[in-house]
Amino acid sequence: MEFPKAVIKRPNYHFEYPHKRKYKRIGRGFSVGELEKAGLNINKARKLGIFVDIRRKSVHEENVETLKKFSEQLSNQKP
């Protein structure tokens, strides 16, 4: 089973045009707020092998949905 990856916005650079900032990149891990919305805590997520980035403050809904789907897959897989 493949572990989920967090998707975050690229940083804003002052020398770029605004239309180039809409791309997203793979982040270091999920934020604490995303974990709480998905019903997980930091310790449980780390035991499951999910990377946690405690420095991030943003909450992206697509990451919350990814975490919910992943936890459903784990609950269905375990006997």
From Swiss-Prot:
Q: Does the keyword Ribosomal protein apply?
A: yes
Task: Please tell me one Gene Ontology term that the record gives under cellular component.
Answer: ribonucleoprotein complex
- List the keywords (alphabetical): Ribonucleoprotein, Ribosomal protein
A GO BP annotation: translation
The keyword Ribonucleoprotein is annotated on this UniProt entry: yes
Q: Which family does it belong to?
A: Belongs to the eukaryotic ribosomal protein eL13 family.
For this entry, the protein name equals Large ribosomal subunit protein eL13
